[in-house]
């Protein structure tokens, strides 16, 4: 059975955890994934991750908020920034918001003739 379905994604804001993974991520077979420069992609929000990972440092600090901000910035740069997501292959291209329509249209043109060969049945016993 031959099927055609273009799977194109644009990440415009926060894409965290299993919610991101299940909503047409590269891991589930998206053909093209774009992200805006201010998007955040990862397992969790950088502030929340910093609170968990650096709880001891935060507890010892007199200025809790500055330590959280500092550690969150480090975490975001290494784990949840759009550049790190692109380096890991989760995002194909980082695009400016004003260019979104152009890139999505180009992806549709590129994938217009896409065909997938799939088995007739999803489950062989049914």
Region locations from a protein language model:
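Ligand-binding clefts of soluble mixed alpha/beta catalytic domains
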Residues: 1-3, 7-126
């Amino acid at each position: 059975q031959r099927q055609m379905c273009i799977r194109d994604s644009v990440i415009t804001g926060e894409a965290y955890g299993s919610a991101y993974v299940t909503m047409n991520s590269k891991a589930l077979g998206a053909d093209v994934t774009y992200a805006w420069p201010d998007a955040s992609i990862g397992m969790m929000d950088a502030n929340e991750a910093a609170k968990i990972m650096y709880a001891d440092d935060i507890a010892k600090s007199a200025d809790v908020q500055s330590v959280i901000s500092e550690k969150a910035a480090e975490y975001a740069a290494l784990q949840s920034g759009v550049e790190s997501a692109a380096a890991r292959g989760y995002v194909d291209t980082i695009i400016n918001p004003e260019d979104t329509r152009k890139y999505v249209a180009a992806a549709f043109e590129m994938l217009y003739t896409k065909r997938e060969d799939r088995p007739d049945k999803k489950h062989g016993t049914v």
